[in-house]
């Protein structure tokens, strides 16, 4: 395992969600079923993780008001920041918008919203220098 990521719910910075964030009291299920939801396309890793998360908390996608399925993480961040809905995304993918206060981040239950990334290779093969360099680069970029 070289990196552990987790999913978070992102929402626009507006009075409704700011109050939710300030009080800390909100029902994730209600928010996801009442607000428009912008999801990644179904074939993406994040899309699969979000679907698995929803299934684990007992929400089927047909109960959501899915406003769009988008294949671009930047587009999702911009749509949510523009007030067009909420989304479930990788925490790493949105830290820039969170830091810039363009989005609000809501934590999801960690034990079911996490995912792990591995570098897999055959242990009996001698890796080329450029492959070893790439692995070191990944480990450096995703240092926890």
Where are these regions (language model features)?
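Structured helix-beta-strand junction loops
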Residues: 5, 33-35, 82-83, 100-101, ...
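Secondary-structure junction motif
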Residues: 28, 36-58, 128-129
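Alpha-helical segments flanking ligand/cofactor-binding loops in enzyme cores
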Residues: 28-30, 77-78, 132
């Amino acid at each position: 395992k070289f990196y552990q990521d987790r999913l978070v719910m992102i929402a626009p910075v507006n009075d409704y969600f700011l109050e939710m964030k300030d009080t800390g009291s909100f029902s994730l299920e209600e928010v996801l079923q009442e607000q428009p939801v912008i999801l990644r396309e179904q074939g993406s890793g994040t899309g699969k993780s979000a679907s698995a998360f929803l299934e684990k908390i007992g929400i089927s996608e047909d109960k959501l008001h899915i406003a769009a399925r988008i294949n671009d993480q930047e587009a999702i961040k911009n749509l949510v920041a523009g007030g067009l809905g909420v989304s479930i995304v990788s925490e790493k993918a949105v830290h820039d918008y969170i830091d810039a206060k363009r989005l609000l981040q809501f934590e999801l239950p960690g034990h079911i919203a996490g995912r792990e990334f591995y570098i897999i290779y055959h242990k009996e093969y001698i890796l080329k220098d450029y492959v070893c360099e790439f692995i070191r680069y990944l480990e450096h970029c995703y240092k926890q």
